[in-house]
Amino acid sequence: MAQSRLFFSADKAEAERTYNILEQAFEDDGFPIAITEIDEDRQIFEVSVYVEDDAEEVAARVDALVGPGLFDTEELPDIDWVTHSLEGLKPVRAGHFFVHGSHDRDKIEPGDIAIEIDAGLAFGTGHHGTTAGCLELIEETVETEHPTNALDLGTGSAVLAIAIARLAPIPILATDIDPIAVTVAAENAAKNGVAEHIVTATAEGFGHPIFRSYSPFDLIVANILANPLIELAPSIKEHLAPGGSIILSGILDSQHDAVLAAYQTQGLTHQKTLHREGWVAIHLK
């Protein structure tokens, strides 16, 4: 199937503004949209939209949204671009967590909480600033609050669920709307020796009957996107145990206040925000 990438580079503020516009406009279309730092010294970021077959139509929509001629288009070979894009990435340290591919096992140091996630069909390897922030908040929250169960909503590769399980042998429900992600999540849980603690399920939002068996949750983590997080605020609060914690990410710096307000409206209290590489992770109770 023909694949194309529409891409545009700019300074951080302009790239984030453009990413926000496209993320909201294409939310229901299923096109992967990414923002990546390509020049650390000059703080230049690249926004990419990945499409199949209908590149001209999508390019016209992009031009109408952000202005004509800003985005270039390139044809992509028929390869697994998630795997390809992660091949050159280094392992990531977040708190005591060390997220790595199988080729970097030799870099594990004494005291590391190692999580092995190879690139594949599901996103969420820990290389993203948004995931790293979640991992740091998870370590702090689990060690201080001692939750008895947890939910990883939009689990992707299950890196967050695995992190919780590595810290505490508690029941963890890991859900995603993508059945491929759910399969990968289960495989990764087994690879990391925590499959007995993690139940995976394909579920959109909280409509699946499995939630009735596991909720309320002492800890809910959700590393998805700002708009779905805002829409899900009432349901997430409904499934949170009294005194429980919520950790949210997948949120750009510029989206922080809107997401926080949605949860404060539900009666939750802001505990902390971590800023990592243009992304934020929010802890509420």
Curated annotation (Swiss-Prot):
Disulfide bond residue pairs: none
Binding site for S-adenosyl-L-methionine: 131, 154, 176, 223
Pfam families: PrmA
GO CC annotations, alphabetized: cytoplasm
Molecular function terms from GO: protein-lysine N-methyltransferase activity
Catalytic function, reaction form: L-lysyl-[protein] + 3 S-adenosyl-L-methionine = N(6),N(6),N(6)-trimethyl-L-lysyl-[protein] + 3 S-adenosyl-L-homocysteine + 3 H(+)
Gene3D superfamilies, per database record: Vaccinia Virus protein VP39
Keyword Signal belongs to the record: no
Protein origin, superkingdom: Bacteria
Subcellular location(s) per record: Cytoplasm
Gene Ontology BP terms: methylation
Record key words, sorted: Cytoplasm, Methyltransferase, S-adenosyl-L-methionine, Transferase
EC annotation from Swiss-Prot or TrEMBL: 2.1.1.-
InterPro entries linked to this entry: Ribosomal_L11_MeTrfase_PrmA, Ribosomal_PrmA_MeTrfase, SAM-dependent_MTases_sf
Function: Methylates ribosomal protein L11.
Similarity-based family: Belongs to the methyltransferase superfamily. PrmA family.
Protein name per the record: Ribosomal protein L11 methyltransferase
The organism of origin for this protein: Brucella canis (strain ATCC 23365 / NCTC 10854 / RM-666)
Lineage: Bacteria, Pseudomonadati, Pseudomonadota, Alphaproteobacteria, Hyphomicrobiales
